[in-house]
Amino acid sequence: MVSKDDKTTTKDSKEGRRIIVADDDPAILRLVTTILEKEGYTVVGARDGREAYKILQTDPNFTAAVFDVVMPHVSGPELVRFMKSEKRLQSIPVMMMTAEQDPKLSSDSFAAGAVVFLPKPFTTAQLQTMLQMLIGKSVS
């Protein structure tokens, strides 16, 4: 009898399927991490923009990035601008998310280089759809 364990159930290898997630709200960080891990991704979490910045300086190997727009120390758009200025990080697609209702935040995020924008609160299905748009291929 051959049984498949969790490590081999996804079509793609989990190696190379890493996403950095930064949000200063611990509940949102846990929620997004849980959803992405169920999709087969390895998640590297950061509690704020400064922590995400430090991670990105030493580790450029991410499939995608998901950042809150408004965070202490370094904002989401500031992180995206940093990524777009670094050759080794330029190709990582970025999703921005926020609970703020100010339309300027989404336009600032896109101007910085974000690919998709997800308003909070969101459903699991909405996050999955935006992730597929972000990465540009189906996760089936």
Stretches found by the model and what they are:
Residues 30-38:
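Charged docking surfaces used in two-component/phosphorelay signaling
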Residues 115:
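Short, glycine/charged-rich "phosphate-handling" switch motifs in NTP-dependent
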